Amino acid sequence: MVKNGQTVDIWNEDGGTASEISYKNIPFYYTTKGYGVFVNHPGRVSFEVGSEKVETVQFSVEDEKLEYFVIYGPTPLEIIEKYTALTGRPALPPKWSFGLWLTTSFTTNYDEATVNSFIDGFEQRHIPLSVFHFDCFWMKGFEWCNFTWDKDMFPDPAGMLERFHKRGLKICVWINPYIAQKSPLFGEAMEKGYLLMKDNGRVWQWDMWQPGLAIVDFTNPAACEWYSKKLEALLDMGVDCFKTDFGERIPTDAVYYDGSDPVKMHNYYTYLYNKVVFNVLKKKKGEKEAVLFARSATAGGQKFPVHWGGDCWSDYESMEESLRGGLSLTSSGFGYWSHDIGGFESTSTPDVYKRWCAFGLLSSHSRLHGSTSYRVPWAYDEEAVDVVRYFAQLKASLMPYLYRNAIETSKTGIPMMRSMVLEFTEDKNCAYLATQYMLGDSLLAAPIFRDDSIAEYYLPEGTWTSLLTGEVKEGGKWYTEKHGYLSIPLYVKEGSIVAMGARNDNAVYDYADGVTFRAYALKDGIQAETVVYGTENELSLIHI
């Protein structure tokens, strides 16, 4: 996250987690001098941060003018709060979105029977599951998008969705902003001018991801309405939310309906895309139920949560890359974040999978997802089942604490998952720490990234107590220790009150009913307090 010595170009690209390019580029940074800088430019912004070209910081755009804001904090959290006041606060995701998501994976073969076998497996193993996601092959292959269920695989989609709802599940489906030439919708979209064009008057197309791919023009109000109606039909059928994939590979030689500069639209396109989808969800589901799962973003995109890290390999290196990228994103005003638990590309070892599950279920949002193989725990080993169950139940029991922090995120812009330096700015040991994080204002989590089960982590000054074991440790020190798979360094900051729910089988329940308050290392004469939100977000305030 420390960019000193780097050249950083703000330019969205589809690059996975193991490259210098990024799906989400935000022209914003903060410094240890008490201020942040936001460059208000939709196109490419180039930053030289004490690189070989400049001694300090320089940023430039290819334009006739440059607008930027200097934001005084003085603390990093205050800078982020003011930055999101300027560019938009993150919306509050629904409670159910904080539970465990399971997917079909990307290019696997599946039908309703396959999906039922996964859901049955979770129920039989007592693993709480909140959301089931259908990736691209809910539609007929290479007709993406046609917004129609593949009848060969899903002959009764409305009935299927109703059956899943009766089992207490929410349903997500994969979409993108593309219309393939094979899609039955292509002719209509071309005829009515809903697609990006070339300067010769023809539709802009390429074969990068599927033959004859065209791109919806979200600067055209009629195209937005047309696209929205397709999504509304799915919501009426029983779909609850959408995974808004892609949005990065946007051409710089296209012609837009409203005459927009295609170079400036390259980064900004994803904002319009996700805004359209999020507005449909708010219209049909209500503001309290709107949530999507987005890969690409630009400044202001935090208003349309949730975002996930993108394509990563299934190994420890990529697991660590994912966290580092996530903390960079949340430091840029994005309040909620997720990643592909177990890794996306290839298939992880059981060891990596189990460690990633602990990390993933101690993230704001948790999704098991892969590319060519399924991510159900029993595909790895029986111990993996125990690990997923344990941490899924732990997260459910932490919902009173997590949801309080989620509400604060929506009010202030301060992220749920935050880098150590955001909370402990004066502690120089935290400046470069990107392998551990604060989950909310009281919990410190340090995932394990080694196959020898060794955890290496740092506790800042103060008294820290393990949430899992009750062990008390002195801060201002580094620790090295071995952990089993049902363990992770998870410590509570001194002076904290953590509200623990009475249930561990679901993310949605009355958090105030039967709640337990755990007080940690309270000092004499100091008053601590916490808040619990009940069924309709009413407050219950406790002072100790």
Outline where the language-model segments fall.
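Aromatic- and carboxylate-enriched substrate-binding clefts and catalytic-loop regions
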Residues: 128-388, 423-425, 433
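Short acidic-glycine loop/turn motifs at beta-strand connectors
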Residues: 30-34, 41, 199-200, 460-461, ...
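Conserved small/polar residues in nucleotide/adenosyl-binding loops
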Residues: 542-544
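Catalytic core of carbohydrate-active enzymes
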Residues: 278-290, 297-308, 321, 325, ...
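Active-site pocket-lining segments that scaffold enzyme catalytic pockets across diverse folds
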Residues: 111-113, 117, 132-135
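Catalytic and substrate-binding clefts that recognize carbohydrates or anionic sugar/phosphate headgroups
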Residues: 1-95, 103-106, 112-113, 119-124, ...
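Residue-level detector of short, conserved catalytic/binding motifs and their immediate flanks
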Residues: 24-28, 33-35, 66, 98, ...
